[in-house]
Amino acid sequence: MVVVSLQCAIVGQAGSSFDVEIDDGAKVSKLKDAIKAKKPNDFKVVDADKLHLFLAKQPVEDESGKEVVPVYRPSAEEMKEENLKWLPDEHRAALKLVEGESDDYIHALTAGEPILGSKTLTTWFYTKNNMELPSSEQIHVLVVVPEQGFSVPTVSQDGVFDHCINPFFLQFRTVDKVGDWLEFSSLLPLTRRQKLYIRSSYQVIANHALFNPNVGMVKYAVVTGTPGVGKSVFVYYVLWRLIKEKKRVLLFDNNGLFYFDGSTMLICLALPSKFNEQFWSPDLWCLVDSMDPTSIPGLPYRLCSVLLASTPRRDCIGEFKKQPPTADVFYMPLWSKEELATIAPMYPHAAAVWENRFDCLGGVPRLVLQDIGTNPQALLMSACSSCSLDDCIVLASIHSGVNSKTTIVQTLIHIRSQEPYREYKVVYASDLAMQLIVRTKWQHDRAKLQSLLGSSDGNPLAQSLCGYIFEFYSMDRLEQGGTFVYRELFSKKRKRTPADGTIDIPRSSQPRQVAERVEVGQHAKQLYVPGTSNYTAIDAWMPQFGGFQMTVGKTHDIKGGAADDLAKLGQNGNRLFFLLPPLYYKTFTKKTPQTIKQYAILVPYPEVRNELSASTLQ
C-alpha cells in the first residue's frame, strides 16, 4: 500500500482545487471522508457518503477529432500495454474547473455512475480503469455534490445562498455568442428553444440601459413594449452580458432568485439585510421581470441599480418611475418580417402560416410563431367583440391602468418604436385589425364612429380608423342617395379649376347588393358592392350611373381593371366618382388613365355630438 496525493476539484465551484493524501489501499468511502474533512465549510450540510466521485481522465480523440472520455476494456490487448492518463492541470477543461465553469468534456466525465464507496482506490484506479500512477500537475478526482448539497460561504453575513443547480442558469458563464445567436445546452424557459436570437435592438437598448456615467450612483432603466414581443427574453440577454462582464447580478425570475457574484452562479434562498451595504451597492444590477421593484419584500431598490422589464402598466412601472434618479425608459420594437424569418426555422409547426399571421397580427413572435392555435382573423374578431370602442382607441402608455380587457385589447393595439427606442407610437396591429374594429362597431356604435371623422385630433388611433369609417359612412350615404356637391376632374395642366356644381345620386332601389363582379345587365339605380375585400377594380357601382371609389387621401390612384368595369355599366355609366372628405376635396386631381371621365364628390362629415369618453383622448 502506498500513500498517494490526489488533486481534487469540486465541479461548479471556483477555486476549489485541493489535494488529499490517502493510502491507495483505502476504500473510496474513506476518500470521501477525507475530502469532507479537508473542505468542511463547503460540505457543511452534506454527508460524506452523499458525495459523488469521478476519475479525471485525460481525453482522447475519436475518428472525427472530437475529445472523448477513454474507456478501459480489459479484453483489448492494446489497452494493457499503455495506462490511461490523468487530466493535465493546464488542459482547457481543468482550467475551467478552477474557474468554477464546466464544458462538454467535464459533463461527459461526470455523466457515468459514480464509484461505490465499498471499492478500494487500487481497484478503482488500476484494476477497473488502468490509470497511471498519480503525480503532480494533474487533476485526479472530480467531486460532484448532489442537489441541495452545497453550503457555500454566504456572500453576505445574513443572506442565504446555495449553489445553483438549475441547468439553464448554471450554463450562462459558458455560453458564447455565435453570429447573432446565443446557443444554450438547455431549453430557455420561455421559448422552449436552445437558441436566443440577438436582435440589433437588444444590443442598442442594453448599451444605453446599462451605461452609468455616474460611478457610485445607482442606475434605473425600464424596458417596455407590446406583450409577446420578447421583453423577458431580452432580460436573459442582459443577464448574459453582465455575467460575461463579470458584474454582480441578482435576477428576480419565476423560477426563483438567481445571484451571480462575479464568478459563480448561486440561488438566493433569502435576501441579505437591507442594511448590508457591502451587498446592496450601485454595482449590483437587479433584473426584475413584470414586478414592481418598489413592492418586492426585502429589496432596497434605492441602494442598487435596477432594470425593470414590463408591459406598459401603471401597477408595475408607475411607482418605480417616480423614484430618483429618474429611470431611462426604452420601448422594445415590434419584429420586422425579416427578423421573424430569421427565427421561423425554430418553429417548424408555424412554417405554413406565420407570414399570414404576421400580416394580420403584426410583429409579435408569441402570436405569429408560438401561440398559433387560433385563426388570426378569429383572434382579432374576438378582441373586437370583447372590447368597447373606447377600449379600442385608448392610448397605451406606461401610465395605463390594468383591467379585465387590457390583455385582450393589446392584441389590437401595439407599441412601435425606432432606434434609439426612447420614443414610441401607438398603432394598430394591421389594416385587418382596423377594418374589423370599424365593421364590428358600425352597427351599435355608429354615432361614436362617425364623430371621430371630424374630431379625432390628438388621438392617432382614432385618426387611423378614419379612413375605414369614411368608407362605411360614404357607402351609407350612397345607398340613401341625395344631392351632393361635385366637380369634374381635369389634369394639372388645365389652369382654371371648374366651379362646383351639384349632382343627384338616385336612392338605391334596394339595400346594397353584393355581387362577385360588374356584369352587363345588372339593375339600374341599384347600388352594388364586391363580395370580397380583394376586389381591386372599384369599391361600388350603379348601372347607368357610374362607379365609385372611397378616397381618404390625395394620392389615391385608379385601380387596375376599373376601365373595363365602367364600360359594362351602360349609358352614362362610363364614369368614375371619387367620394372625398372635406380635407381633400378641393385639391384632388385627375388620375391616370385620364381617358376615364372622373369626378370628385364632396362627402361632408356628419354633424353629431362627440360621445367619446375623455380618457381615450388623453
UniProtKB/Swiss-Prot annotation:
One GO cellular component term of this record is: host cell nucleus
**UniProt signal peptide:** 1-19
Annotated region LQLFLAK domain: where? 18-57
Glycosylation sites per record: N534
Going by the UniProt record, its keywords in alphabetical order are:
Glycoprotein, Host nucleus, Secreted, Signal, Virulence
Region entry DWL domain, spans: 58-139
Entry keyword Glycoprotein: yes
Location(s), subcellular: Secreted; Host nucleus
User: Motif HVLVXXP motif at which residues?
Assistant: 140-146
- Function statement: Secreted effector that elicits necrosis in host plants, a characteristic of plant innate immunity.
Give the domain section of the comments.
The CRN proteins have modular architectures that include a signal peptide, a conserved N-terminus, and highly diverse C-terminal domains. The conserved CRN N-terminus harbors a distinct LXLFLAK motif, which is followed by the conserved DWL domain. A highly conserved HVLVXXP motif marks the end of the CRN N-terminal domains and forms a junction where diverse C-terminal domains are fused. The conserved CRN N-terminus mediates the translocation into the plant host cells.
Family, according to the entry, reads as follows: Belongs to the Crinkler effector family.
PANTHER family in UniProt: HOT SPOT (RHS) PROTEIN, PUTATIVE-RELATED, PROTEIN KINASE DOMAIN-CONTAINING PROTEIN-RELATED
What is the name attached to this protein's record? Answer: Crinkler effector protein 16
- What is the scientific name of the source organism? Phytophthora infestans
